[in-house]
Design a protein with these regions (language model features):
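Small/flexible residues
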Residues: 8-9, 16-17, 185
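General helical structural elements
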Residues: 10-11, 18-19, 151
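Short, surface-exposed loop and linker segments with low hydrophobicity and enrichment for Pro/Ser/Thr
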Residues: 14-18, 120-121
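Bacterial N-terminal signal peptides
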Residues: 17-28
């Protein structure tokens, strides 16, 4: 009788082990699916193509952020539903991720002394518009955290853009020979002979 029970238990354990193994293999696929990408593939390709031209890259990020801001604004006028709240939460998270990514790019371009003044002016104007849209959005429990993070990120980006515009204006007054360059080129030193 012991063997009969043991024989019937082993196949059941194998089935459970196989099921558990399958679940462990499938779980990472669901985790990857949940990771949101704030840009579409064509937008990512445009960013890549503009990769070596800082002002174009900033202009593209500004354009894509304007599109997200318009989407957020259009969602605020819709009837309050769970689907709307989820869509707003996703858009706000994407918006924040893009602003943070743009901020990182600005840091890099600033360190290189790339002349990005032309792109900073429209960015600075846009950040004011984005913040007014975000502040006008009445928070709901399902997306209030994302809204607050977007406002904080927007304020940081607005401050950064204005500060960089001032710094760059002052820098290029002193370094006129470097103005309008995508990155500061090292100056050649005369050979000491």
């Amino acid at each position: 009788m012991f063997q009969l029970t043991r024989r019937s238990t082993i196949p059941k354990m194998r089935k459970w082990t196989a099921l558990l193994g399958l679940l462990l293999l499938v779980q990472p696929l669901f985790a990857q699916k949940d990771k949101r990408e704030p840009l579409t593939e064509p937008e990512i390709e445009q960013i890549r193509e503009a990769g070596i031209v800082p002002s174009q890259r900033i202009d593209l990020y500004t354009k894509f952020l304007n599109e997200h801001a318009d989407t957020i604004k259009s969602l605020t006028a819709r009837k309050k539903t769970d689907a709307r709240a989820q869509h707003l939460d996703n858009e706000l998270q994407d918006f924040t991720a893009l602003m943070d990514e743009l901020g990182s790019n600005l840091d890099t371009y600033s360190d290189r002394h790339a002349d990005i003044r032309k792109a900073l002016k429209p960015l600075s104007e846009s950040t004011d518009r984005w913040l007014s849209i975000l502040r006008a959005l009445i928070g709901e429990p399902s997306f209030d955290l994302a809204r607050k993070e977007a406002i904080e990120s927007g304020e940081d980006l607005a401050d950064q853009a204005k500060r960089l515009l001032t710094e760059q204006t002052e820098y290029f007054i002193l370094h006129k020979d470097e103005a309008y360059q995508e990155r500061a080129e090292p100056k050649s030193k005369p050979d000491d002979k």
